[in-house]
Curated annotation (Swiss-Prot):
UniProt feature coiled coil, ranges: none
Biased composition range(s): Polar residues: 110-139
Transmembrane segments: none
Gene designation per UniProt: SCP
GO cellular component, one term: viral capsid
Listed InterPro entries: Herpes_capsid
A Pfam family matched in the record: Herpes_capsid
GO BP annotations listed: viral process
Subunit annotation: Interacts with the major capsid protein/MCP.
Subcellular localization(s) per the UniProt record: Virion; Host nucleus
Organism: Human herpesvirus 8 type P (isolate GK18)
Protein name per the record: Small capsomere-interacting protein
Amino acid sequence: MSNFKVRDPVIQERLDHDYAHHPLVARMNTLDQGNMSQAEYLVQKRHYLVFLIAHHYYEAYLRRMGGIQRRDHLQTLRDQKPRERADRVSAASAYDAGTFTVPSRPGPASGTTPGGQDSLGVSGSSITTLSSGPHSLSPASDILTTLSSTTETAAPAVADARKPPSGKKK
């Protein structure tokens, strides 16, 4: 089991020899020995080196996350959001304007009375229906589409009923 014992790392000595001019080694060598013994000083120097390496990678992380790359990435995301909103608004306005087409399916979407009028008092021919299939909308959407289309055809009649009679005022 003594074979598996972790020995003291020799990173410090390797850095001193291999990378003598590296900025981390220069900062490590500025550590003041003070009144420490040589053994304590080597341990503290090793700990300081670990801190310097961690600090170096943390600064690199901050540069990457807060620097130019991060700002460019965030700006790209911000630029995409208005386009997505504009697409949604244009689709909704196309639907409201009546240019949004929906294929019809056979059979009426709501029951009609014998006089050819549905329960809302609008003729059955003005009701649009949605197609059935694997990609069709839910029955609640069918009802909403039916109601919106009947409202669009009934709206001029309601507006005409609200107009005051055109005549001379006394």
